[in-house]
Amino acid sequence: MNFYLDVVSLTKTIFSGFVEKIRVSGSEGELGIYPGHAQLLSILKPGMVYIFHKKDKKEECIYISGGILEVQPSVVSILADVAIHAIDLDRSRILKTKKNAEESIKSNNTKINKDAILLQISKEIAKLRVLEVMDKFK
């Protein structure tokens, strides 16, 4: 048994197809969604959408910057501002962005928006976690 999943960013559809299960980071913790799951609407934190395809036993990961999860009887939709396939993430760029943001926080510059920088750091950490999971698949 499976269900239809759509993962959509502001600019394009990242994934659309039948899956056996997914795992996402909701505002209240990790959510595992299986066929026949109860209807649900949840805010998603920056992190990973883990997708499992039973047919070919394929696992796939997508980074999302946060968003909304809607679960209906036969369709699950994830709407995210930013969604990137794990294979398209650039580890060196992520580490550089994270380092620059951390240095901005340490600089004690009163003109910076520390909340925005801390959010950026958390998003970069979430991307690194997605890459760590993908490394385990290899």
UniProtKB/Swiss-Prot annotation:
Name assigned to this protein: ATP synthase epsilon chain
Record-linked NCBIfam families: ATP_synt_epsi (TIGR01216), PRK00571.1-4 (NF001847)
GO cellular component terms, semicolon-separated: plasma membrane; proton-transporting ATP synthase complex
MF term (GO), any: proton-transporting ATP synthase activity, rotational mechanism
Coiled-coil annotated spans: none
InterPro entries listed in its UniProt record: ATP_F1_dsu/esu_C_sf, ATP_synth_F1_dsu/esu, ATP_synth_F1_dsu/esu_N, ATPsynth_dsu/esu_N
Subcellular location field: Cell membrane
Subunit annotation: F-type ATPases have 2 components, CF(1) - the catalytic core - and CF(0) - the membrane proton channel. CF(1) has five subunits: alpha(3), beta(3), gamma(1), delta(1), epsilon(1). CF(0) has three main subunits: a, b and c.
Keywords: ATP synthesis, Cell membrane, CF(1), Hydrogen ion transport, Ion transport, Membrane, Transport
Membrane topology: Peripheral membrane protein
Role summary: Produces ATP from ADP in the presence of a proton gradient across the membrane.
Species for this entry: Buchnera aphidicola subsp. Acyrthosiphon pisum (strain APS)
Annotated TM spans: none
Family membership: Belongs to the ATPase epsilon chain family.
